[in-house]
Amino acid sequence: MILMNNPGDKEVLRLLKQRMESVSQVEETVKEIIRRVKEEGDRALEEFLKRFEKHPVGIENLRVTEKEISEAQVEEEFVETIKIVIEDLKEFHRRQEERSFFFTTKGGSFLGEMVVPLESVGIYVPGGKVPYFSTLLMCAVPAIVAGVERIAVTTPPNENGGISPYILKTCEILGLKEIYRMGGAHAVAALTYGTETVKPVDKIVGPGGVFVTLAKKHVYGDVGIDSIAGPSEIAIVTDGSADLDLIAADFLSQAEHDENAMSVVITTSKEVFEKLPQVIERHLEALPEERRKTARISTENFGTIILTDSLKRAFEISNLIAPEHLEVLVENPFEPLGHIKNAGSVFLGKYTCESVGDYGAGPNHVLPTFRSARFSSGLRVSDFTKKIFITHLSEEDFRRKSELYSKMARWEGFEAHARAIDVRREKL
């Protein structure tokens, strides 16, 4: 664990750079995987399926059958819970819907902006170790609200080559039938470029580990992506009024996700700074073995506690980190809202642990990481739509404005543009 007493911006940025460098070590491998899947299709994909998946998957059983989906067995309570959460998520995401608009100018021209859903989207659902059905919900619900026609789901198989029944049942409830058992960079490449078996999509959304995050970064431009949603992050700003057990529990809630996850506590309390490491250790020991192992590595490498002399400085550091998740555990959690500039999602007060955001409080949990919250946002309905401009110029407006447009074209040096306008003026 890293302890920092009143660090400057350079020290904080150095810490963040170290984490990014640890991730970028696999970048060349990712590029090679993408290149080969793009050029060789199924042949390369099958090789990577056998090399990287926990259970070797052949091309012939890459896609999950409808029979497998319908036969997925889960508790009835799970089904009822998922249905409740879907409605809660829809209630929030419907408020994000953007409307087309059209209007007529004084001269009779018809102008507007048409909001159109994307035709196809690929959802990457992390898997293998645990069934991230919550991520499936967070990605699929806004896509459904937006009206996306084709939604493909890809998730790594477990050690038996199967997909978690919780994932399959969630797909069935959502009405999703196109499901692939593949993960990693090769899954991203297959959805981007297509293969003989996998049909390409227009956009890929969903978080993943290092390989997935870097793969999405490299295919962007050939396909749309949501954001750089990689290994999890949390920053907790506290003035010392919060219970140490709450802080420690929330710290580890992200550390258990991934060995490259980053948990940071920024506090104005010397007591928190000095005592929290021991409390975190106690909570760490209480975790199941596999989660404890992951959380310990993450905590040792990237777990950080920072002491500052004021809440103002605490939020300056938080804005510098631009965390995926930001918890505000202070006496009056609404008061500092004006200081928050960079964060994927903000959780206010002692009852709003980040975990409730993971499982359906309303806002999406697919969020920007690696400081990309400085310029991007969490997944939302508009990520699944595009805007198409509509123009119909009336004869009156053309007569009145065409000479101006013709002159502008010539000032820019585009004679053919000007002539396209002039030839119409000559025929009036």
Swiss-Prot record:
Molecular-function annotations in GO: histidinol dehydrogenase activity; NAD binding; zinc ion binding
Family membership noted in the UniProt record: Belongs to the histidinol dehydrogenase family.
Binding locations of Zn(2+): 254, 257, 358, 417
Binding positions (substrate): 232, 254, 257, 325, 358, 412, 417
Keyword Oxidoreductase found: yes
Taxonomic lineage of the native organism: Bacteria, Thermotogati, Thermotogota, Thermotogae, Thermotogales
Entry's cofactor comment: Binds 1 zinc ion per subunit.
Pfam families listed in its UniProt record: Histidinol_dh
Cofactor(s) needed: Zn(2+)
HAMAP family reported in the protein's UniProt record: HisD (MF_01024)
Source species: Thermotoga maritima (strain ATCC 43589 / DSM 3109 / JCM 10099 / NBRC 100826 / MSB8)
PROSITE patterns on file: HISOL_DEHYDROGENASE
One Gene Ontology CC term in the entry: cytoplasm
EC number: 1.1.1.23
Listed pathway(s): Amino-acid biosynthesis; L-histidine biosynthesis; L-histidine from 5-phospho-alpha-D-ribose 1-diphosphate: step 9/9
Alphabetized InterPro entries for the sequence: Ald_DH/histidinol_DH (IPR016161), Histidinol_DH_CS (IPR001692), Histidinol_DH_monofunct (IPR022695), Hstdl_DH (IPR012131)
Chemical reaction(s) catalysed: L-histidinol + 2 NAD(+) + H2O = L-histidine + 2 NADH + 3 H(+)
Active site: 324 (proton acceptor), 325 (proton acceptor)
Entry keyword annotation includes Glycoprotein: no
Top-level EC class: oxidoreductase
Keywords: Amino-acid biosynthesis, Histidine biosynthesis, Metal-binding, NAD, Oxidoreductase, Zinc
GO terms, biological process: L-histidine biosynthetic process
UniProt superkingdom: Bacteria
Function: Catalyzes the sequential NAD-dependent oxidations of L-histidinol to L-histidinaldehyde and then to L-histidine.
UniProt name for this protein: Histidinol dehydrogenase
